[in-house]
Amino acid sequence: ENGAPVFPTGGTRVLAYPAPHYAVADGGQAGLAAGGSGDYAFVYLNLRMGKGRSEATQQRAGQTLSEVARTFFAPVMAQRHIGITLQIDVGAEVFDHKHSNIHPLFQKS
């Protein structure tokens, strides 16, 4: 906002991991009945951002990320049943400590 990046490079963290145990809907019965494999998939995207960004910026970030996710997963969705969830949380932290020497790498002189 105000010309600054919405998500500064030095503050960006990405985490991805498969769920070793999961269940989706009816175990695949409706997918099989619809001519699919019954092997459902899902992606849960959660963005946590610190306080201070306007609601318009939060909404714009959500819309942009939704479009990127839809485009990215379109080839998968064309082949199998998949659910995509994107949720954005804005920090209401009761404790928020950050210690990093990464940010200075991206500071402009």
Which ranges hold each PLM region?
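A short amphipathic beta-strand at an alpha->beta junction
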Residues: 10-14, 75-93
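Short, low-complexity, polybasic intrinsically disordered segments
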Residues: 93-109
